[in-house]
């Protein structure tokens, strides 16, 4: 089974419960040309929605009949733990409810689940990666060493793609 690696990131500039401008990025380091990177920017959204949108578009980039192992690196614990801790399965079994009530971003979670179901030959592995490691590192030698790590580079690429300011036009709806 072939392995496809993707780095995903989402971000939004929000204050409290308000929505703000945001974007997401999906980066495939082993692909080339227009298939290597994808991003969109939005008005009136939140970070969680952008993180999920990045995952959604990474999944939809895989052909329905492909027998591949899709490995997603994400700095979003919310997204990664929803898979690794089995939260998504629990939400589905509970009618899209959790201990706080209705699952947030249910429309995106349903769309992700649908796309996964459409790809029965694909397996999905979710891996959490710490964000902004290079920017946080003060020591120059350690910073240089971090820049040699392909996972750090992939995360940085997805982070740059997720910046809504790189888009000349922001979409008004973040619905998939």
What are these model-derived regions, one by one?
Residues 1-49, 53, 57-63, 140, ...:
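RNase H-like nuclease fold core
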């Amino acid at each position: 089974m072939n392995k496809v690696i993707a780095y995903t990131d989402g971000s939004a500039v929000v204050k409290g419960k308000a929505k703000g401008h945001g974007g997401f990025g999906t980066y495939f380091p082993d692909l080339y040309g227009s298939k290597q990177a994808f991003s969109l920017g939005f008005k009136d959204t939140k970070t969680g929605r952008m993180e999920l949108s990045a995952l959604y578009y990474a999944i939809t980039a895989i052909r329905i009949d492909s027998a591949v192992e899709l490995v997603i690196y994400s700095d979003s614990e919310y997204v990664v733990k929803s898979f690794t801790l089995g939260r998504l399965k629990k939400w589905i079994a509970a009618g899209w409810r959790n201990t706080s009530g209705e699952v947030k971003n249910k429309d995106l979670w349903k769309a992700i689940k649908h796309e996964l179901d459409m790809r029965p030959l694909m397996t999905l592995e979710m891996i959490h990666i710490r964000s902004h490691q290079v920017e946080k590192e003060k020591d120059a030698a350690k910073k240089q060493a971090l820049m040699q790590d392909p996972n750090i580079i992939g995360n940085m690429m997805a982070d740059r793609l997720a910046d809504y300011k790189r888009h000349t036009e922001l979409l008004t709806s973040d619905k998939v």
